Amino acid sequence: MPVLLDSSRAPRLDALLSKGNTQGLECQIDSPTGDLPLIAGIGTLASAGAQEIAFLSNPRYQSQVASTAAAAVIVTLDVAQALRAQGSTLVFVVCRHPYLLYARLAQWFDAERRGLPPAGVHPSAVVAPDAVIEEGASVGPQCVVDSGARIGRGASLGPGCIVGQGSTVGANSRLHARVTLYDGVHVGARAIIHSGAVLGADGFGFAPDPTLGKGAWGKIPQLGGVTVGNDVEIGANTTIDRGAIENTIIGDGVKLDNLIMIAHNVRIGAHTAVAACVGIAGSTVIGERCIVGGAAMFSGHLSICDDVTISGGTPVTSSITKPGRYTGVYPYSEHGEWQRNAAVIQQLALLRRRVRALEKA
């Protein structure tokens, strides 16, 4: 990673730890000489320079510590002791959770580099007379804030965002460029929504209507909305449909990657993480603290209990009532071999009957 701050703004290591929200991490600095370097950025063990801090969270990279040029390295106590025994003179930040400390410090550097958007409403934005823009909020160029909408204290809307009628954006939330919130969408505090995300479009609701013709469909108006909790992150071009009657609900702390499709009436429990290209069909309920791998697909009207991990690419077609990891992906192979195996799979029911007949003979 490139140096993020110039030397005049780089904090000393102890000051960085004070600024970087180390609450609950029990960090200690171990400097053989007592000197504390200035830290201007974060890097990997292989790439960090003399004013950057690096971290070791995966033991397979421990050999890189000996050759790193980093000003300091975040390590666990046992690693620090082992490296000192080998004669290392590096400055260590000793912490039980190096990866989490790295994340906290990266958050601080990101905020320092990016800064806060200017408070106020850009002249090109269109804000309804009865919309509320709270103190410290920022409404960027070409934004539209519709009637009855509210933008919370310290929240920011990037260029081209649309906040529909009666929708709300919570305090200190950030909508990147071109995010669309339809009417009746409520986003909690400290949320991050990336470009192109659309919240509150109509769910896919249609009723067979023979009065319109054979095989015709009549639209079911989607009367619910979308509720997004606090500390949620939603990736680029992800869509969350509004509920048919009740709201589609995304719980506190949920993390959604890019290009996810969440259908109407879905409920996702707190602190669940969903990777890219997942599809969740209507009225499915996913519990708390679940992890969903990329490109997994959920049928509608399912119930997934808390603490479930779904492997990438898995089709989930029935409810899950027991915590654990579930995988339903047929492994890839050379195409010709796959064709031969596929032909066998089509005959599994017949083969099963034949085996049973042989067992009874």
UniProtKB/Swiss-Prot annotation:
Molecular function GO labels: N-acyltransferase activity
InterPro entries the UniProt entry points to: Hexapep, Hexapep_transf_CS, LpxD, Trimer_LpxA-like_sf, UDP_GlcNAc_AcTrfase_non-rep
Active site: 264
Alphabetical list of SUPFAM superfamilies matching this protein: Trimeric LpxA-like enzymes
Chain's role: Catalyzes the N-acylation of UDP-3-O-acylglucosamine using 3-hydroxyacyl-ACP as the acyl donor. Is involved in the biosynthesis of lipid A, a phosphorylated glycolipid that anchors the lipopolysaccharide to the outer membrane of the cell.
Assembly with partners or alone: Homotrimer.
Protein name: UDP-3-O-acylglucosamine N-acyltransferase
Organism: Bordetella avium (strain 197N)
